[in-house]
Amino acid sequence: MEIEIYDELNSSDSLKQINGLSKLNQFWINQGRDPTLFFTSIIKLISETDNKTTRILCYSILKSCKCTPSDWSLAIPLLVKDLNSDDNEVVISILKTLPHISSIFTELLMMGNADFGPLVRHGNPSVRKTALDTLTSLLFYRKSILQSYKSFVSTGWELIVDRILEEPIPMVYQSSFSAISSLFSEISRSVSHSDELDNSVQKRQVLSYYADWISLKLIDHFDLLLNRAQHIDINQRHSTVNTLTYLVDTISRSSGTPFWPTSFDNNNNNNNNQQINNNNNNNNNNNNNNNNNNNNNNNNNNNNNQNNLINGISSMNLSSITGTTTTTTTTGNSPITSPTSPTSIIANTASSNKTKQISSPQNIVSILVEYFLSQLDSSNDSLVFAVGKAILDLLLTQQNQHNENWINPVLTAFIGLLRREGVSLNPLPILLAIMSVLPMLGDDLLFCTLSRIFPSIKSITDSNQRVSYLIRTFELIIDRHVTSSGKSSLFTPLMTTDCLLMAFQDESSSFREEIIVSMVASHHNILSKYIEIESEKNSNNNNSSSGNSGGGSGGSVKFSTSGNLFYLHQAALNISEVCLKCITWQSERISAIEYCIRFVDWLCRVTLSSSSSSNNSGNGSESQYGIKLISLLRSDLLDQINKIPSDYICLQAVFLICTHLLRSPTNKVYEQSDAGLLISLLRRRFLFLDNQPKFTQYNGNIRDMIMGVSQFGRVSPASLHSLSGYWLGALECLYLMGLHIPSVEATVQRTLEEILATYPHNKSVYSRARFIRRMLFSSTSSALDAQSLGKYSTIRNLNSFTNYTIDFSYCIPIEQLEASNSLHSISDIFAYECKKAITGLVGVHYGSSIRDKSSRDVTLISGASDPVWIEVSHTTHPTLNTITLHVQVTNVIHFSIKNVNIMIGLSGHLDFPYPQTNCKHNIPKLLPEKSYSFEVPLNVSSLDYNLVTFKLTFNQPSGLCESENNINLNNIHTKINNYQQSSDQLLVQSIQQQQQQQQSSSQQQSQQSQQQQYQPQPISSVNSGLSSYSLNSNNSGSLNSSANSHSISTSAVGSPGTASFISSSLLSNAQSSSPTTSSPLSNVINQNIISSSSSSSSNANQITSTTTPSSTTNSNNNTTSSSSSTNPNPNPNSHTNLNSIVGSGINQPIINNQIIQSLSITTNNPSANIIQFSPIEIRCSDYIFDWNQFLIPFKYNKHQFIQQWPRFEAVFSIDVVFEGFVSVASIFDCLSALPLHNVLNSEFGNSNFHFAFSSSTWFNEQFCFTISGMEKCLSFPEDYSIYYTSPNGQSLPKYKVYHARFEFRSSSSSLLASFESIIDQWINKLPRPTSDQFIARLLAPDEKSLFSITNITQDYQAPKNHQSLANTPLSNIVDDEIALLNQWKDFKKSQEQTKKLFSQLALDQDFY
């Protein structure tokens, strides 16, 4: 193909030239290859041909070339020549090429031909438009041009300003509008979207300087700009909004106060409408009003005019982010006399040769807003949203925040955008714009607006943004209720609207729970704000009270009868009335219900305590609030308590009623009946469950079913937790009722006695119930006096029992009481234990959405061929923001392993709950086929990028390292046989290579041995691990194990370089980030050789003949003294046992001779009995938490709402295969050649990567993508040469296949849909800047992506390899890994089956 294209490009026939260029574009560039190879032929073709089509094709191909500046210098004369060409299409093709070859921009400037003046004033409008677009892209997206060529930049902006004023064709000056709008948006936004996200102060200052200069140039031409904007096509007219709005705001700020007052009432609105309708008198009245206002505010504005101009330019946020929706709206009661009145007036002014402007600094805002209001009827969504957002921005910046004539049409248009049917979009940009207007609205209009936008709030895709918007909305409602002294109450009517009633009945979505949480969080935020205000007032008046606290959840706030806190109390009652309806919801997301229960508990403590004190003072309103709250507790909580589906919420509700309702004086009549109802509920649902076959506990819920014992006669009863959180909470509720309610003493005492009689063998439950009974009903005179039981209660006889120290001999601790030393009283100990019970710190967890189950399957993070397996799972606790990590360590070989250490590291937003958490776990001795389990508690503060790292170190297996009488290696043959086949071929090659070297250079070795008698072996130099070969003089050429982590590199054991090489290979294995797949036994053998070499080198002065290479074959005595041993007594059969370990395919005499010598036994050397073994270190795979595995509610305390426009709303993903002689670096170079910014670059080893790229385009056409890739394990020759053929016949090991998942995101769904239709062409056209020896393709129809394999459900069958390659080390390792993984899965399946056989809960589940 290359030769054919090259011949056609160098042909003299124009048709062949065009054909060659077409082939180059279709079969080369479209396949992602770099056409730089044909650069010389293309330059020659441009210089010689006169054919227009050929030249245009050549310039389009030059955009894809990656040449050096010296090569580009050949093209500069041709570019300069053709820029002055008479052919417009050639000039346009060169202009489109210039941004892609900006590296030669310096040469173009030096030659004086980079002046865009003649181009932007060209006679052809297409050339002028292309020149403006090219100039804009050079000014914005080329950082070097902005910094280095200041004269070119200033000249370029002058040309853009000149075209926006002088250009007659709308299609052309629309490009100038776009460029200036982009500049104004760039200096207004908080984060830059251009030039690689460069947010430096220097760049902002330079852009602000040009923006100020452009504003001064265009201020006098506003009428002309407004007239020109109306002639632009309606689909592109949104690009003019930023320019007009920025200019109007700058003019208005620099001139002073406009004619309207700061607040509007009905009379002012009517007068304003009359003034606008009378066009003749309008200007005079406005000028008179303005003169008066300017005279009144002269002293305030004279000193600030210049500052207002600068601050207005630098601080405005007027960027218009457009959406992809359509609407038809009406302007409502807008102050427009006729839709075409601004157009006609401005046209007349433009035709009168600028005799007198109709716009003045006082009425220029009104003129622009009238024009914008007329555009709200447009059918283009981008224009509707842009002008609506601009009107709202002018309302906020021009001190006209109550002009309903502006607000109503915009609200109508925006709600029309939100309620369009058949349009799928992210409504957050429109809702954020509406949020800025909500504080300006009256109560009626606010209620109507909120009721209409609530369905759109539900459609926000991101949960965090949805909850944040709800919090801001409810904060506005509560704040307005407080500031209006209770006159504005929107909670009750808003909650009775149809949209919210339907939301509360929808069980499939979490929107109703988010509404409940947002109400509670917003009240907490407003309360915190007003408490700070009240405390400041009290401190100023020197009347500060220590009783007020800043927290809304635990403080004892005393409400006064007048003031803000009093009306906040009213709002809290309204919220609790709405929230208590949620306790009967059938939902696993009970965090919202828990928020509600705790909020009502806080409100009861505040209200009922204040109402009891106000009854003494005679205040009736506070007692009325207390009566209302008691009635709410009775009607919405007590009457519905049997219908609460969640045991956890039910127990909290009982605790709430025992604490507040039963102790209220107004509830004396119903005290005994209510307490009896609660005690029966506790007995039936929580207490009498343990070891009773007729009651069954299933998934946390109790089913009261009576079944025959014979059905479950063979099954052991369900073993529940001895003292779970339910037990503790139920006993605490009994304690509260027995302590505070005398009328139910007999019922409580009888219940405790039945517990003691029913569960005598459950020591925890028995001791806890006995402790409560003695505290409540034992006599003060004598604990052994049975007649006085129940007459004199120990606790009630004491006036204050807070100082009463308890006897811990009555109370067995639940687990270990962390704060036992600081708890000295009965109330403290019970409050602490109840807190542990309610919040789930002890016993079963009852707040999680995944009950009593691990949040994901067990994951094997160690290598399947490692002697120690580490299996990890976790359980989330959403109500606590914690995770419990379950780690199981298993010894899978037949030898015990000593001193196993597991180091745990945290990354991301994970943390240990307290500093003394042990992150290092030590196992002194791990027996064969035994498991050791432990748990690690973790705190979670955020959901992104969380992972746990594991590092495993252990000593050599005791069967190989300890000094025993016999070495018997037959025991581990069954476990390790599959591990060692991978090193057969390498060992054979190395031994044959060494044998040849020994035969050919025996004389040279003898000479070297004489020199080495006085020179010790440099073993210490090996620890650096920098060299792939052994650091010895003869350099035996051993293989480097770091080149292939799957192979066991072994050289001749007799050579002196073996120890250094093996130590470097072990260091590389220990430092690798992926799980080790090498054999543990080979590491053991290599480690013994290392120790032997180290001991021999340490004793080099005593034994000088040990470093002689020839001694390995000539003298057995030298070899024996040079190597340390694992056995003081030699075993004559050890060489036969080693055959099963090392491999049977090795030459038998050689392996016997070498291995026996390396493991021979010495008794002559006294230092051989002291053996130093360094532990084996394994770095396991990271245990990664996905964001959806946490299910943790957000913390809403002082929630900060980020007002930032979302950048992306649409997304689609696709899997791509990179196949050939490819690497991670070549893939990154391939993607870096795209015109996108690399915002994330993460490489994990040589086989995994994660990149992210983002664009810098404008006006809601933003685009980004992330790519995650992993290397696929291949088996040759099946996986080779399917879609790609090697051009150079390279070797098979260099051939790789990477599976990558692209995830594309864009703020425009239509853009993403059009991009999706050409994704296959885009993949094929990926550039190849460095190497083109690989292809990028989509998945084949029968091909499965690696990303779609989330778990292993069935045994994976290894592909059948070719006969000639069946014994390769790589194929053996793959087979061994798969076999071990299948063995691990079988083991897990057998465990699950045994659990099902003996678990009554599982049988009950299957039965139902």
Swiss-Prot record:
<comment type="similarity">
    <text>Belongs to the TPLATE family.</text>
</comment>
<feature type="compositionally biased region" description="Low complexity">
    <location>
        <begin position="266"/>
        <end position="308"/>
    </location>
</feature>
<feature type="compositionally biased region" description="Low complexity">
    <location>
        <begin position="998"/>
        <end position="1051"/>
    </location>
</feature>
<protein>
    <recommendedName>
        <fullName>TSET complex member tstA</fullName>
    </recommendedName>
</protein>
<dbReference type="GO" id="GO:0006897">
    <property type="term" value="P:endocytosis"/>
</dbReference>
<dbReference type="InterPro" id="IPR002553">
    <property type="entry name" value="Clathrin/coatomer_adapt-like_N"/>
</dbReference>
<feature type="region of interest" description="Disordered">
    <location>
        <begin position="1091"/>
        <end position="1139"/>
    </location>
</feature>
<dbReference type="GO" id="GO:0006886">
    <property type="term" value="P:intracellular protein transport"/>
</dbReference>
<dbReference type="Pfam" id="PF01602">
    <property type="entry name" value="Adaptin_N"/>
</dbReference>
<comment type="subunit">
    <text>Component of the TSET complex, a heterohexamer composed of tstA, tstB, tstC, tstD, tstE and tstF, which may act in plasma membrane turnover. tstA, tstB, tstC and tstD are likely to be the core complex members with tstE and tstF acting as associated scaffold proteins.</text>
</comment>
<dbReference type="InterPro" id="IPR011989">
    <property type="entry name" value="ARM-like"/>
</dbReference>
<feature type="compositionally biased region" description="Low complexity">
    <location>
        <begin position="319"/>
        <end position="347"/>
    </location>
</feature>
<feature type="region of interest" description="Disordered">
    <location>
        <begin position="998"/>
        <end position="1055"/>
    </location>
</feature>
<feature type="region of interest" description="Disordered">
    <location>
        <begin position="259"/>
        <end position="347"/>
    </location>
</feature>
<dbReference type="InterPro" id="IPR037501">
    <property type="entry name" value="TPLATE"/>
</dbReference>
<feature type="compositionally biased region" description="Polar residues">
    <location>
        <begin position="309"/>
        <end position="318"/>
    </location>
</feature>
<dbReference type="GO" id="GO:0030117">
    <property type="term" value="C:membrane coat"/>
</dbReference>
<dbReference type="InterPro" id="IPR016024">
    <property type="entry name" value="ARM-type_fold"/>
</dbReference>
